[in-house]
């Protein structure tokens, strides 16, 4: 029996292509993740894959597994991150980004829950549920993304971190969803 912990993978990281949110270049993030011994890093800029090519080149150079993804804030729902599982997933992700960008003015996007009806095949979906998220939401998302929905907890270093984690654990347990 081994006591070694599994490798750490950052599943949600924005670069300076997420304007006013990310500060570092994608390639700098990759190099730093490798220095810290990460097993993998997901670059997940908001409704964009703009940093992926540079991140890919850097990941090849340092031998880090790069996960390709994007973050979305739905107009009528929560924040989600989608991670492409393969080339088909990458194509589905780019189609969703294109749909959202075409609907809005330059530099913006507009996506709703209805736009996810296809289930965005071949993508893992990280749901940033909140303590206010409902069982109905969990059932709906689980049905839309069968076997590919993970509830995501971000430690924000706020006084309510423990309460948020408890609520998300309950939601994950009730609906048999992984919590990451």
Locations of the language-model features?
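Phosphodiester-processing cores and adjacent nucleic acid-binding clamps
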Residues: 1-180
């Amino acid at each position: 029996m081994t006591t070694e912990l599994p490798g750490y993978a950052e599943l949600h990281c924005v670069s300076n292509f997420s304007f006013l949110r990310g500060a570092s270049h994608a390639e700098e993030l990759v190099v730093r993740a490798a220095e810290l011994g990460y097993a993998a890093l997901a670059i997940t800029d908001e409704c964009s894959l703009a940093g992926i090519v540079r991140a890919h080149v850097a990941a090849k150079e340092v031998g880090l597994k790069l996960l390709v993804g994007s973050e979305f804030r739905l107009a009528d729902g929560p924040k989600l991150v989608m991670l492409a599982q393969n080339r088909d997933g990458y194509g589905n992700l780019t189609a969703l980004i294109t749909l959202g960008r075409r609907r809005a003015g330059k530099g913006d996007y507009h996506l709703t829950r209805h736009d996810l009806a296809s289930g965005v095949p071949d993508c893992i979906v990280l749901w940033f549920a909140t303590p206010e998220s409902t069982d109905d939401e969990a059932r709906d998302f689980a049905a839309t993304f069968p076997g590919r929905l993970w509830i995501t907890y971000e430690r924000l270093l706020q006084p309510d971190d423990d309460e948020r984690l408890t609520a998300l654990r309950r939601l994950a347990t009730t609906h048999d969803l992984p919590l990451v």
